Every structure is written in C-alpha cells, then in structure tokens.
Amino acid sequence: MNWRSEHIWVELLKGSRKRGNFFWACILFLGSLGFLSVGISSYLGKNIISILPSQEILFFPQGVVMSFYGIAGLFISSYLWCTILWNVGSGYDRFDRKEGIVCIFRWGFPGIKRRVFLRFLMRDIQSIRIQVKEGLYPRRILYMEIRGQGIIPLTRTDDKFFTPREIEQKAAELAYFLRVPIEVF
C-alpha cells in the first residue's frame, strides 16, 4: 500500500507475513512432525500414528536419521514462525519533500536493534539506482545512494515479482519525486 501527495510519499512494506512464508512454515512443521513420529515409533517398536507405519523401520540407522531430520525441521519451522510472528522486514519508506527528510523504518529481530530507523536529508541523496541481474534467478533491486552513507536497498531482494517495466516505472517516479538522477548497474 502506498500513499502519495504533492509533498509526501509513504510506501508501506509487507515484511515476512507473506502467503508463501505461511505455506512453507506449515509444510515444514507438518513434515518434521511426521519424520519425528516415525523415528520415535521405530525406537518404541509400535506405531504412534496409524497413518505412518514404522514397524519395518529399524531404529539404527533409519530411525535415528528420521528423528534427526524431524528435530532439525522443527527448529527451522520455529525460526520461520518467529519471523512471521515478529513480522521481520516490514516497515515503511517516507519521503517528505516539504521538510526535506527521508525516513526509512524496518522491524528486525527482537533485541537492542529491533527497530531500524534511518533518517536522511533529501539533499544528501545522490541518485536512485537499479540493479538488474537476468538469468535463471533474475533480480531487480531499487537502491538509493546517499552521500557519505553508501547505497540503501528500497526493495527486498526476494521480490521477484517486479517486471523490468515495473521497476523502471517505480524508479522513474521516485527519481522524479526526489529530483535526482537514475543509474542502472
């Protein structure tokens, strides 16, 4: 969702609460429970869940490996669920032409630096950069180059949904709003 007026441009970012992350967290959790239950069933010598027959599986080495995969999958699944719960990566970009200030805010992982808040003067913005990498894994990333600070990504690196036309359009609109040049690399 974006909001624009003559002097202010606010762009909200979704973060990790995406449909794909929910899907993979559920699949990983259920698959890990299946692996772990088969490993435990092979250790006990009886079926815990009737759908997953495991009496033919020896505990050593198959049951041990299944248990290990189940535990590892539960750890990865819990990491995904925590990023979804904390909404890591969400935030906003606010460009205020009237005040001459750019504010970038992102939520991170819990801790001292949970809130990432960057603030710049508009006159320090040198350019808007577009990085385009085509091939098997295409990447189109929009950056803002700040004098003395380097480059700051404005779009997420996993946003593969931008077509070349969309990223060019977004860069052109932002460069026009900020009155800075566009660079492509």
Curated annotation (Swiss-Prot):
Bilayer-crossing regions: 21-43, 63-85
BP-aspect Gene Ontology terms: photosynthesis
GO cellular component terms listed in the entry, alphabetical order: chloroplast thylakoid membrane; photosystem I
Entry keywords, A to Z: Chloroplast, Membrane, Photosynthesis, Plastid, Thylakoid, Transmembrane, Transmembrane helix
Main location: plastid
Superkingdom of source: Eukaryota
Compartment list: Plastid, Chloroplast thylakoid membrane
Membrane topology: Multi-pass membrane protein
Signal peptide: none
PANTHER family xrefs: PHOTOSYSTEM I ASSEMBLY PROTEIN YCF4 (PTHR33288:SF4), PTHR33288
Family: Belongs to the Ycf4 family.
Known function: Seems to be required for the assembly of the photosystem I complex.
Name by which UniProt lists this protein: Photosystem I assembly protein Ycf4
Native species: Triticum aestivum (Wheat)
